[in-house]
């Protein structure tokens, strides 16, 4: 069996996911085979593997850092919040059902064997498994059924490093308080702590570090400065949503709905120098974007209701009348249609609701979930926004419960040619007659830079600007370089030799 180490946190969003990714890349650089593992993840950001199984995106980018193919066993339990204190429960990549938190709390004990099996499988195949906890590891009211933090560390017999976020303040109290709430067996597992997201001069922190070590009786393995290395965030508690538009040639606005999922679909735009992004929150009005995107969502009907109540629907239609480009991904695609039907109450108690009506489509929610990777070719080129798009190859993945039928006033966007490595031939997506409203089920479609850059250059041409080439030729290559930057950065600020000593 291989070695293992587990990073746990004093709270959510302390930076565990990025640190795990960095360690995965460091160990890979040092000649080891390495895999990430997170027993339970709660997130709306998910991914579909080559086997058609669903998993959290955090373990996907960690697997990328380790230079291995992501598999669902790296995240055996995924919870996707669906509102009203309920979550869709996904085990080993497949939907088990929707459960209220009280029912899931009891169900967790049935998952212990699954966690043992999936972890042991990875641990037997890789030299090192880097494990990640979830949220705070000292939730004393949930400890008897913990499968995410110390409970999982016990299953795996893994040493633990605790991560605290100094940027939010109170890091010494949070680390010391966390240690105080652990029982003696759990304390013995903790071999060190990391102070993350530090801003300022480290010299000013040294006395505090020494005092903390005296209190908690374990070493501070590193003080990691805040960094803007472009690595995916695990959940929506992220600074990217707080960004406002900077001066740039092309402005993109994305409606941040309450159940927005897969915001990683839009990370590619941050690599394009002529693009600025603004996420539109509740109570905010749309501006004058060149592209408006309605993203994917875990609860399409609820988020459509949100768009109506917030007054955004009329603003969306106004942008359409101005000829602006409107793009819907997955749930956003469904909303842009004329009707959404839910005969089996998959989404809500409402059986039928009018859509925004900018696409001549009708969506019916089905009981079975579509989860697949696909490859496609763009087939439509019917407006100035779509010049030079015909024939472009794109890849993506689908995660949805609905089936969308096109009417006579729309055309298909793309031809699916491969599905889960099998050759197929069917059309997908919709484009209105004017060519300025586009819908697709393909998450990740913008990651194909030739496709995305063609759209951006069409907008530049429409605005009387010259074309630009992307400085990033491949999004995967760009991410790979960022993982190397992250590894170099962590080598500088963490005691990597100490981490090797800790692993067992």
Curated annotation (Swiss-Prot):
PROSITE patterns: GATASE_COBBQ (PS51274)
Pathway noted in the entry: Cofactor biosynthesis; adenosylcobalamin biosynthesis
Residues at the active site: 330, 443
UniProt keywords, alphabetically: Cobalamin biosynthesis, Glutamine amidotransferase
Gene Ontology BP annotations: cobalamin biosynthetic process
CDD domains on file: CobQ_N (cd05389), GATase1_CobQ (cd01750)
Residues in GATase cobBQ-type domain copies: 249-451
Gene3D superfamilies (alphabetical): 3.40.50.880, P-loop containing nucleotide triphosphate hydrolases (3.40.50.300)
Molecular function via GO: ABC-type vitamin B12 transporter activity; catalytic activity
Pfam families: CbiA (PF01656), GATase_3 (PF07685)
Top-level division of the source organism's lineage: Bacteria
HAMAP family noted in UniProt: CobQ
Protein's job: Catalyzes amidations at positions B, D, E, and G on adenosylcobyrinic A,C-diamide. NH(2) groups are provided by glutamine, and one molecule of ATP is hydrogenolyzed for each amidation.
Family named by the database record: Belongs to the CobB/CobQ family. CobQ subfamily.
UniProt protein name: Cobyric acid synthase
Organism in which the protein naturally occurs: Clostridioides difficile (strain 630) (Peptoclostridium difficile)
């Amino acid at each position: 069996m291989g070695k293992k180490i587990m990073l746990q946190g004093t709270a959510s969003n302390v930076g565990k996911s990025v640190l795990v990714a960095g360690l995965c890349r460091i160990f890979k650089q040092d000649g080891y085979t390495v895999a990430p593992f997170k027993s339970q993840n709660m997130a709306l950001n998910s991914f579909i593997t080559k086997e058609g199984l669903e998993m959290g995106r955090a373990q996907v980018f960690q697997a990328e850092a380790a230079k291995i193919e992501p598999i669902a066993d790296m995240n055996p339990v995924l919870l996707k919040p669906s509102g009203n204190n309920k979550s869709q429960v996904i085990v080993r990549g497949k939907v088990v059902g929707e459960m209220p938190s009280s029912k899931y709390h009891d169900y967790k004990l049935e998952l212990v064997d699954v966690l043992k099996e999936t972890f042991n499988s990875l641990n037997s195949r890789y030299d090192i498994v880097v494990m990640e906890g979830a949220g705070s590891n000292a939730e004393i009211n949930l400890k008897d059924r913990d499968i995410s933090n110390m409970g999982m560390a016990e299953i795996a017999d893994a040493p633990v490093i605790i991560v605290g976020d100094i940027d939010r303040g109170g890091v010494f109290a949070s680390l010391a308080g966390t240690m105080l709430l652990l029982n003696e067996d759990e304390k013995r597992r903790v071999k060190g702590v990391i102070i993350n997201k530090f801003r300022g001069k480290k010299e000013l922190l040294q006395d505090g570090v020494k005092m903390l070590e005296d209190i908690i009786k374990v070493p501070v393995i590193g003080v990691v400065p805040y960094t803007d290395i472009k690595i995916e965030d695990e959940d929506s508690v992220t600074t990217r949503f707080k960004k406002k538009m900077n001066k740039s040639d092309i402005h993109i606005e994305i409606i941040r709905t309450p159940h927005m999922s897969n915001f990683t679909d839009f990370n590619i735009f941050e690599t394009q120098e002529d693009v600025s992004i603004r996420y539109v929150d509740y109570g905010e009005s749309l501006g004058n974007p060149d592209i408006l995107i309605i993203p994917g969502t875990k609860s399409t009907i609820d988020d459509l209701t949100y768009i109506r109540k917030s007054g955004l629907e009329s603003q969306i239609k106004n942008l359409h009348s101005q000829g602006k480009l409107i793009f819907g991904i997955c749930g956003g695609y469904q909303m842009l249609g004329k009707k959404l039907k839910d005969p089996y109450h998959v989404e809500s108690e409402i059986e039928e609701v009018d859509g925004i009506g900018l696409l001549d489509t009708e969506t019916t929610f089905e009981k079975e979930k579509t989860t697949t990777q696909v490859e496609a070719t763009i087939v439509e080129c019917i407006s100035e926004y779509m010049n030079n798009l015909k024939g472009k190859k794109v890849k993506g993945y689908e995660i949805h419960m609905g089936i969308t039928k096109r009417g006579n006033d729309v055309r298909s966007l793309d031809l699916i040619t491969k599905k889960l490595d099998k050759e197929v031939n069917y059309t997908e997506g919709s484009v209105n007659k004017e060519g300025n409203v586009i819908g697709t089920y393909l998450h990740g479609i913008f990651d194909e830079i030739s496709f995305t850059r063609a759209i951006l250059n069409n907008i530049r041409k429409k605005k009387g600007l010259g074309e630009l080439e992307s400085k990033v030729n491949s999004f995967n290559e760009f991410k790979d370089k960022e993982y190397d930057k992250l590894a170099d950065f962590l080598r500088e600020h963490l005691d990597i030799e100490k981490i090797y000593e800790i692993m067992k």
